[in-house]
């Protein structure tokens, strides 16, 4: 069953009528509803084109958070082979919010790291809704160290509202773990390609997104804080999240114009959740092209370019 967002009500109404007509035809084969169904499907396409061509920042945030949007595990299954996940930080415990390990991409050995939100109640609790604790970032550091040691390109997939802000996480050094992970991303002498596939929230995102190439899916968002959090801080009113989202410049178009990201991966009309295979394939093509380009550079050059890239962002914004 499709989960509709608030602004998708016209689409919901039309698709509801299509379902009713198909059910009616199934119950009585003498009734021909094909012409009406075709007409309604055409109206659905027109409605989606109209709605998705003018999404505002808050609506894009809702699309980025859609529960049926493809997650890290979907990309891992479709784009990579021989994925061998690594677990634990060798200091405290395992954190399933971050998935990381070794795999092959188009036959090439790589390291992959990403946040996983889960797709049902059980898996969301297991993965802590994609909000990593220090152990997750220290696991990412382990994989980055392995990649550097064995000269493996790194692919990171970002999808988190932010790092977990719990007391235990803070007591175990959340800030230090995020800083160390960011530092490791900046220091390794291998290519890093990062893609924001959903939400890119705060330091929890940047900790694994400090890549030589950074891309965003068309309807993903990337920001220092959630719109609700920004509204609560600025105006003491979380209901002004829509206003905050607009002012924060969190969309892929905003960030491309600001020079924060290198490119935008188009999504089908209706969002990635409507055609996940199409989006995953397009993402794979972008990653492949970026890795092919970056493979021509030396390790020293890769590290220097990556550092300069993020220094320039800090100086120019």
From Swiss-Prot:
Key word Transferase present: yes
Pathway entry: Lipid metabolism; malonyl-CoA biosynthesis; malonyl-CoA from acetyl-CoA: step 1/1
Reaction catalyzed: N(6)-carboxybiotinyl-L-lysyl-[protein] + acetyl-CoA = N(6)-biotinyl-L-lysyl-[protein] + malonyl-CoA
Coiled coil ranges: none
Keyword Ribonucleoprotein: no
Gene3D superfamilies for the chain: 2-enoyl-CoA Hydratase, Chain A, domain 1
Annotated GO MF terms: acetyl-CoA carboxylase activity; ATP binding; carboxyl- or carbamoyltransferase activity
GO cellular component, one term: acetyl-CoA carboxylase complex
One Pfam family recorded for the sequence: ACCA
Domain of life according to the entry: Bacteria
Compartment list: Cytoplasm
Domain CoA carboxyltransferase C-terminal: 39-293
Family named by the database record: Belongs to the AccA family.
HAMAP family recorded: AcetylCoA_CT_alpha (MF_00823)
Protein name per its UniProtKB record: Acetyl-coenzyme A carboxylase carboxyl transferase subunit alpha
Organism of provenance: Agrobacterium fabrum (strain C58 / ATCC 33970) (Agrobacterium tumefaciens (strain C58))
Gene that encodes it: accA
